[in-house]
């Protein structure tokens, strides 16, 4: 049986003068945001494949490490995160950004960990629930004991109409912080510092390298955080206990570089500096994180991961310049996309699941059409 050749990109967006560190699609319009390491934020029309607007939003010395848009923020806002210790929220209207940010959060965090806007389960997610009992891969769970708990509860409706929360690696690089984008206030730290000896664990994990914030329907309004660390471990916090994670697993032998939670909030994907891509399942009743598929690569280094909103396709961005496409349900490889001639930094799917974007150190953004969803 002959294999079909991998497709070429439908378009390549050129305009950045430095490595494109991050990209994200607008939640409802044909717009793509991209941020580069020289501090430039570009807005692209993904129908006409042209720049709509560009602005220098962080200093060239520090650059952008993350751009984020979400239904939680609304249609007219986008967030940029720089290595200058700031997160800025911008108004996006009339084809361009506001001259000044609506709000600036001074996190004093100087690192490469991209922030995460809290998300709720997607209605577009049609993937069948994973049968966790059928997963045979083992995992190690930390015993929490009967410690007093501090909990923060966020209702799903509040995320749309009230406070907007982001998770970010903190001023102490091993600590995850939760911030309210509306007020620029820090509302939680993970772990919550109480001066007890048990709080030594995060430092042993090293720096927080990747983070995802989500609001699973099973959590009764409790925000969950997945954090990947320098030692290859991943911790799941559910904020009922700010001192100790719900569980901690070590699937990787090198620093975790990327995490993505799927639209059902029942599983996800991780990439690291080692040669493995891991698809995992979250059992909310047991508080466990279990491997359901381990993919071993010929060359190490996965800088970015993304899962399509419909839950069918997953993509990874590799140090080897390649974009890899997988069947997310089965974990089977589908294609290797070859366009970029330098490290691929990140990948992102559009909200309608019709486009995939990849960004690279070669200063370009490639747009791909793959396995289009049924309409």
UniProtKB/Swiss-Prot annotation:
One of its GO terms (biological process) is regulation of cell cycle. It comes from Nicotiana benthamiana. Gene3D superfamilies: YVTN repeat-like/Quinoprotein amine dehydrogenase. Keywords: Cell cycle, Cytoplasm, Developmental protein, DNA damage, Nucleus, Repeat, WD repeat. The lineage of its organism: Eukaryota, Viridiplantae, Streptophyta, Embryophyta, Tracheophyta. It is found in: Cytoplasm; Nucleus. Disruption phenotype: Reduced plasmodesmata (PD)-mediated horizontal and vertical cell-to-cell transport in leaves. One of its GO terms (cellular component) is cytoplasm. PROSITE patterns: WD_REPEATS_1, WD_REPEATS_2, WD_REPEATS_REGION. WD repeats lie at residues 15-54, 59-100, 144-189, 203-247, 251-290, 297-338, 339-375. It comes from the Eukaryota. Involved in the formation of X-, Y-shaped and twinned plasmodesmata (PD), thus modelating PD size exclusion limit and regulating cell-to-cell transport. Cell cycle checkpoint regulator that monitors and responds to DNA damage such as DNA cross-links, and triggers the halt of the cell cycle progression in the presence of DNA cross-linking agents. Mediates the active process of aluminum- (Al) dependent root growth inhibition and thus is required for response to Al toxicity. Essential for signal transduction and development of both male and female organs. Belongs to the plant DSE1 protein family. Signal peptide: none annotated. This is Protein DECREASED SIZE EXCLUSION LIMIT 1.
